Amino acid sequence: MKQTTSAARSEKLDVLFGTPVFAVVIAILCNAMWGSAFPFIKMGYRLFAIETSDTASILCFAGIRFMLGSLLVLAGSVVLEGKLPALPRGKVFAECCALGLWQTCAQYAFYYSAVALLTGAFGGILNSTQSFLGVIFAHFLYGDADRMTPAKALGCVLGFAGVLVGTIGNHGGGSAFGIFAMLLATVIFTLAGPWNKSVTKKADSFAVCFLNLFVGGAALLLIGLAMGGRLGRVTPAGVADLLYLAFICGAGYVIWALLMKNNPVSRIAIFGFVNPVVNVFLSALLNGEPLFRWQYVGALVLVCIGIWLVNKAPAQKEKL
C-alpha cells in the first residue's frame, strides 16, 4: 500500500513539474534562490560576527550549513519516494564520501573564503565562469555527445569577456586572493561534475547528494573547529539566515532534480542567467554594495547572454 501511495505521489509530482509554465516559473525561482546564496552568506558573516580574516569560523559556518542541507535531502527522499535513501556500501560508499570531500569540502572552503573578500557583484561574475568551463570540459570529456557548437563557443567568448570586463579597474571589488579562491572553487566545481554524474549511476541520487553534503559539511566543520573557529554571536536573524542557506542547498537539489527529470534540459538550463542578476541586486539590497558600476553592468550583460547561449544551444540541436 505504501509503495502504491508513493508511486501515485511521484506520478502527480512528475505531471506538475512537467507542465511547461510551472517548470519555467520554478526554474526561475530555483536560480533566484541560488543567486541569493552569495549575499546571504555575506550577511551571515555579519550576523554571526565573523571577520573576513577568520577562516576557521568561516569554515564552521559553511560546515553547519551543508550538514543541515543534507538533512533536507533526506526529508526530500521521504516526501518524494516514501522512504529514506538506501546508502551504498563498500567502494561506492567510499567514492561518495570522497566526492563530498572534493565537491563540498574543497570547493566551498575556497568559495566561502572568497565570499568574505569579494563584493557580491564581482564574486558572482567570477563564479559564472563555471558555466563556460563546464561547456569546454564537456567537449573533451563526452565527445560527440556534447560537442562544442558555434552558439556555445560564442557564449563562452562573451562569458569570459564579461569576466574580463568585471576585472578591469577592480575598484574595491576584491583582493587578489579572493579572486584566486573563487576561480579555484569554480575549477573544482567543474571537475566534480563528471565525477558526480558517474557516481549517481552507481547509487541512489538522494543517497549520493546526502553523503556529498554531509561528509563535506562535517569535514568543513571539523577543520574549522580544529583551527579554533566558532560562531561568535548567535541571534534569531543569524539562525534564520543559516536555515535559509541550508534550504537552498538541500531543497534546491530536490527541486532541480524534479525539473531535470521531467523537462528537456534546454527548457530549464537557459534560466541560469537569473543567478548572477539576483546576486547583484540582493548584494546591493542586503549588504549595501554598489549596484551601477559600469564594469559590473557591462560584465553582467555579457555573462547573462553567454549563459543563455551555452544552454540554448542544445535546444537548437534537438530541433534538427
Annotated model-derived regions:
Residues 73, 137, 148-168, 273, ...:
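Hydrophobic transmembrane alpha-helices of multi-pass small-molecule transport proteins
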Residues 19-24, 54-59, 88-93, 168-188, ...:
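Juxtamembrane helix-entry segments on the extracytoplasmic side of multipass membrane proteins
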Residues 2, 47-103, 133-137, 188-192, ...:
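Transmembrane alpha-helices of multi-pass small-molecule transport proteins
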Residues 2-60, 171-198, 247, 282, ...:
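Glycine-/small-residue-enriched transmembrane alpha-helix faces in small-molecule transporters
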Residues 78-123, 127, 163-165, 245-263:
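Specific transmembrane alpha-helical segments of multi-pass solute transporters/efflux pumps
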Residues 64, 104, 108, 122-131, ...:
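Helix-helix packing/entry segments at the starts of transmembrane helices
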Residues 29, 33-53, 68, 108-118, ...:
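Juxtamembrane C-cap of transmembrane helices in multi-pass membrane transport proteins
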Residues 31, 39-42, 73, 134-136, ...:
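Transmembrane alpha-helical segments that form core, pore/gating elements
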